[in-house]
Structures are given as C-alpha cells and as structure tokens.
Curated annotation (Swiss-Prot):
Name of the protein this chain belongs to: Probable transporter MCH1
Organism: Candida glabrata (strain ATCC 2001 / BCRC 20586 / JCM 3761 / NBRC 0622 / NRRL Y-65 / CBS 138) (Yeast)
Keyword Transmembrane helix: yes
Gene this chain is encoded by: MCH1
Family according to the record: Belongs to the major facilitator superfamily.
Protein's membrane topology: Multi-pass membrane protein
Highest classification ranks of the organism: Eukaryota, Fungi, Dikarya, Ascomycota, Saccharomycotina
InterPro entries in the cross-refs: MFS (IPR011701), MFS_trans_sf (IPR036259)
C-alpha cells in the first residue's frame, strides 16, 4: 500500500537524508535499536506506584484522587488501541510516534510545573486537579501510541522472525518498570529539602527524555516509510513493464472491483459476527475480573506497602516494583515458550490460563492473610520477605495473563479478526482497573487514613479474591462453550 500524504510529508526529509549518510544495513539496524529504546520508555507510566507519597504529602492528594489518576491513565491506554491501530494502518507508525511525543512532552511539562507550585494552590477546589487528569489521560493514550509505533516498526523491520519483531520489543516494554525504578533512585530526584521523591524533577526529566525519544522514533519510523516507499516504486515499475490491453484491463478491473466489493461485504459480516458473539463478552468478563485487581496492585503498590509494613521501609516500594517488573518480564518470555511447547504437543493452553488465575487468587489470599496477621514492627524482616514473595507472585500472574489472553484471542478469532476482537477485549481491563482502584481508594480513605493497623486494607482483598474466583468460574464456562463449538485452544 502506498504511503499516505501524512506519512509521506512526515518522513520525506529523513527518507532523502538516510541513504546519503548511512548504508541501508546500518540505517536498518539503527532504526531497530531506536525502536527498542522507544518500547522501553513507553512503559514509564507504570512508575506511578512510586508517586503516592509525594502526591499525598506535597499536594495533599487523597487516595481517591490518586486512583482517579490511575483510572484515566488506564482509560487512555486501553480504550484507544482500536483507533490507534486504524491510524497506524492508514498513515503508518510515524503518525502514532509524532502524536505520542506531542502528548508526552507538554503533559509532563505541565505536571512538573504544578508540582513545584505552592501546595496551597493545588487543591482540587481551585480546579487544577481536572487539568492534571486530562494530562494523565493524554499520557495514557501516548503510552499506547508510542508502544504500538515501536512494536509495528520492529515488526516491519524484521517481519521474518518472531523473536526480533515481537518478543524483544515486548520484553523491552516489560522492562520499563525495572529500568525506570532504578533511574528514579538517582540522587537528583531526592533533594535534601524533600523527604520524598521530587516529582517536579521527575516529570521534567521525562519531558526531556521523550524529546530525545521523539527524534529517535522519528528516524526509526522514517526508515519503515522508506522501505515501504521503495517497495511501492518497484511494484509500480513491474506493473508498467507488463504488456497492456485495454479490453483485458477493463475486464480485469470489473472483476477486481466485484471481488473487492464481495471481500468488503464478507469482512463486514465477519465483524458483525465477532461483535454478536456472546462468548466474546463472557471472555471479556474474565479479563475484567482478573486484570482489574492486578492493575490496582501496581497503581497502589506504594500506599499498600506503607500500610502492610507500617511505613517503616520507604525503600521497599521501589524494591518491590523492581522485583515485580523483573518477574513479570521473565514470565512473559516463559509463557510464550510454554505456549509453543503446548501447541507442538497438541495440549490445551487453557491449563496455562487457569494456572495463572489460581496464582492470582492465591496472591490475593496472601495479601489478605498478611493484612490480618499480628506481626509487629519487630518482625520487619518477616514482613518484607512476605511482601517480596507477594511481588513475585503478582508479577507472575500479571505477566502470564497479559501474554496468554492475547494468545487465546488469536487462536479463537484468527489473525484477520485479532485486532477487532482483542481491541474490544481491552476495554475490560480499563473498566476492571477503574472499579478496583476506586474500591481501594474508598477503603483506604475511610479506614486507613487515620489507622495504624494493617487490617484496615483487608476488605479490598476480600473483594479481589472474589473477583478471581469469578474469573476462574467464567473461564471454565467459556472453555465449555468453545468445546461445544469445536473451537480448540
């Protein structure tokens, strides 16, 4: 497909410049490396779990406000992929990358400015909290846009190998939390006059980082446009070299038009079949119940750690996020390998899904038991060890489920309908995380704000445990319905 006018103008200068300064192979490899850097930085929004303390102490945000921020981020990330996919298909990944950078830079610059203002002017009553929500919604959309742009770029640069096109960029995205949490340990972000993370400096640094990333992904996506443009030229030359006959050509055009109309009608019928499939929505309900609590854990990791550890381990949140991110990334890779093994052995991958759901359920029980335990501050080593194990188990559940759900979607609805089906299903974690985060905020603000006991948070994990039980039950129902349809997973 020829370049759109937007993709043509955005990539024109680099398409002209790259062949003059780099060989084709060098520009190809550099573009891939730049796309991986974009994939790594696209996930920095997950560091929000480290922002709870400065938001609460410096800006006097309540847990409800913090979870509202998390909710709008998830809405931006999960509700827009179908639209972003259409834009990328029509106008290329360069359009997504430019839009993402234009979303990141001013949003983070504004957030840095508001954090450094006097906290007396940052209360919700003066209306400044609403622009903050708008900024984080834009950041959520930009996160999906930059990640999609990087992923599509890698896939187009190395379409022949799943390792380079899918696995490595996906792994880089999973490493965002780990790399970002280590980056925020730099002393620059912890000035002596701040007893907590200076989010003004953090957000300002992010604005500069995304400026650099914007240049890098512009180069990478322009290389993709160059490859497409060269392919279009070769196709045009081949077509002009063929002998022409007006009658044959007209007959061919009529048949081609008829074929395209038939294909369009068939595609519309297939789309309607997907949207009318009740099993799709039951499957979406399992995602709603499972991924909602896991997203909530990431968002509230800082405040949860303070509640469970009594606020005596300020470095625990960062360490917990690091181990969580590492475990999640390794699980994503391991799950992909396990799925390949199961497919070769003709084993059902539903057992992998059920295993991760059980791990998630057990983890909710572990958090509940720790919240109800009688361990005091003299047992901090034991408490920290339990939190460490909880972080590992949550990472396994999160990484595994976020890998197995799209895999099953691809197996059931096929490659042609994958984007439509999975884009629809991605609404579920957005709604699920919104519900779970607001439940957490309500319990935290009403029970834990003035409490010194960790049991105040227990009602949240009674609810999340029930959600995982529902997810397991609905998964069994879905697999039975698929078996009746002779759909094997």
């Amino acid at each position: 497909m020829a370049l759109s006018s937007i993709e043509h103008y955005l990539s024109y200068h680099l398409r002209v410049l790259l062949p003059q300064v780099l060989s084709s192979k060098s520009s190809h490899n550099i573009a891939y490396i730049f796309a991986l850097f974009a994939a790594i930085t696209s996930g920095f929004v997950s560091l929000i779990s480290l922002y709870a303390q400065p938001w609460q102490e410096h800006l006097s945000y309540s847990s409800w406000q913090i979870n509202m921020i998390v909710t709008v981020i998830n809405m931006g990330m999960y509700l827009t992929p179908p639209i972003l996919g259409i834009i990328a298909d029509i106008h290329g990944p360069i359009t997504l990358s430019l839009s993402s950078v234009l979303g990141f830079i001013p949003s983070y610059a504004y957030l840095a400015y508001t954090f450094h203002r006097d906290h007396s002017f940052t209360n919700e009553s003066d209306g400044s909290f609403t622009p903050t929500l708008v900024c984080f919604f834009i950041i959520g959309v930009a996160t999906s846009g930059l990640y999609f742009s990087a992923l599509i770029t890698c896939a187009k640069l190395f379409p022949g190998t799943k390792l380079l096109s899918i696995s490595i960029p996906t792994t880089c995205y999973g490493l965002s939390s780990l790399i970002g949490s280590q980056f925020l340990r730099v002393k620059y972000f912890h000035p002596v006059d701040y007893p907590y993370l200076d989010l003004g400096r953090v957000f300002k640094a992010f604005a500069w980082i995304y400026t650099v990333i914007g240049v890098m992904i512009w180069i990478a996506t322009s290389k993709v446009a160059q490859i497409q443009h060269e392919a279009d030229i070769m196709e045009e030359q081949d077509r002009m070299a063929e002998p022409s006959d007006n009658d044959v050509e007209n007959h061919y055009d009529d048949n081609e038009q008829s074929r395209l109309l038939h294909a369009t009608h068939a595609q519309q019928m297939t789309l309607m079949k997907v949207f009318r499939d009740p099993v799709l929505y039951i499957f979406g309900a399992t995602i709603f119940c499972a991924l909602g609590p896991l997203e909530m854990f990431i968002a509230n990791m800082g405040s949860l750690t303070n509640v469970l550890a009594g606020g005596h381990e300020p470095a625990m949140s960062s360490a917990l996020l690091s181990i969580y991110a590492l475990t999640s990334t390794l699980t994503r890779l391991g799950t992909g390998l396990t799925v390949d093994y199961f497919n070769k052995r003709q084993l059902s991958v539903k057992w992998i899904l059920l295993l991760f759901l059980v791990v998630g359920l057990v983890t909710q029980g572990k958090i509940y038991m720790l919240s109800m335990s009688s361990l005091d501050h003299s047992h901090m080593v034991t408490i920290n060890r339990k939190l460490f194990y909880i972080g590992i188990m949550q990472g396994i559940a999160y990484g595994g489920l976020f890998t197995i759900y799209p895999t099953i979607t691809l197996m059931v609805w096929g490659e042609k309908m994958f984007g439509t089906a999975y884009g629809t299903l991605m609404i579920a974690p957005a709604l699920g995380s919104a519900l779970s985060c607001l439940i957490y905020a309500d319990v935290y603000d009403s029970e834990c704000a003035n409490s010194t006991t960790r049991s105040c948070i227990a009602p949240v994990y009674e609810t999340t445990a029930l959600e995982f039980c529902a997810a397991i039950l609905l998964t069994v129902v879905v697999t039975v319905l698929w078996r009746k349809r002779r759909t094997h997973i």
